């Protein structure tokens, strides 16, 4: 196919032509026009969470995981104790990065097909007063589970614990209001539900704790406190910024606002999700999660029971038809994932279902029903 393939993944995503065209101009990293773009992006990001009074936002080069790691290193003191609420692969990544930077880390495990429990968190905090910070993955895209941010935030606030939220796959699609939800840090990135391109993360940090973060990070480039102070003083990034990514994000945010902001973005993703679920059910596919805990971000489907099914061939066939799927991330059952986000609508989701039907036909599979 001549046109770009549609990415049905949790990021990078399909972007609009306007976003792509924004990257055709070169920018100087110290140029006043570029610094103005950075400032505008930061203001717009704070607008989305209604956070101007309570938080600052610090952009950082790299993937979203860079910013998660930077947030933990900047916020958690060296003698701090982090509790990770674990119900999936991206929770386990948070555990690993916390351990690698030498912070004490405890894991509170949950089933990968269920949201984390605020009640279990409360019990753990009562049992271990040494815990200083809690890490929550808002939308655990390993399976697609939506975790209860408000309830977890309320428990952390009641116990005086710092909350670090990985909102990578929820920010700008699901409502997050800093006036209602108390968190010390919330992390997201350019290439997710804002529909920019990958290459920049950003961390919202509560103003009340900011000064206490000075000198905590053992990294030069990933010290969010130093990054913030330098930006406030100079309007510039400390080190070479991803100029094209920042400008593309500014354009993507403009389109986000034109669409109607977070409520409109969520409504489109929900339509995408409904179209996908209905179409896949016709083919015999069954989603892994109960709809009550499924975020309209990415959907995990059971693999067909048919012995002729093989994901690599299935993926390649769908890709030939213009759609890029995503492998499963679960440990116990064979699955694959289909994203509902990006610059796409129900029409593209219908086309994706048609492509998946063609992939099954290529493999000689008449029904995609799972084994159980």
Swiss-Prot record:
Cofactor: pyridoxal 5'-phosphate
Coiled-coil ranges from the UniProt annotation: none
Keywords associated with the record: Aminotransferase, Pyridoxal phosphate, Pyruvate, Transferase
Residues recorded as bearing N6-(pyridoxal phosphate)lysine in the entry: 192
Matching SUPFAM superfamilies: PLP-dependent transferases
Pfam families with a match to the protein in the record: Aminotran_5 (PF00266)
UniProt entry tagged with the keyword Kinase: no
Catalysed reaction, written as an equation: (2-aminoethyl)phosphonate + pyruvate = phosphonoacetaldehyde + L-alanine
Organism superkingdom: Bacteria
GO molecular function, one term: 2-aminoethylphosphonate-pyruvate transaminase activity
EC code(s) of this entry: 2.6.1.37
Cross-referenced InterPro entries: Aminotrans_V_dom, NH2EtPonate_pyrv_transaminase, PyrdxlP-dep_Trfase, PyrdxlP-dep_Trfase_major, PyrdxlP-dep_Trfase_small, SP_NH2Trfase/AEP_transaminase
Enzyme class: transferase
GO process annotations (BP): organic phosphonate catabolic process
Family as reported in the entry's similarity comment: Belongs to the class-V pyridoxal-phosphate-dependent aminotransferase family. PhnW subfamily.
PANTHER family linked to this entry: 2-AMINOETHYLPHOSPHONATE--PYRUVATE TRANSAMINASE
Function according to Swiss-Prot or TrEMBL: Involved in phosphonate degradation.
The protein's assembly and partners: Homodimer.
HAMAP family linked: PhnW_aminotrans_5
Stated name of the protein: 2-aminoethylphosphonate--pyruvate transaminase 2
Organism of derivation: Polaromonas sp. (strain JS666 / ATCC BAA-500)
Organism ancestry: Bacteria, Pseudomonadati, Pseudomonadota, Betaproteobacteria, Burkholderiales
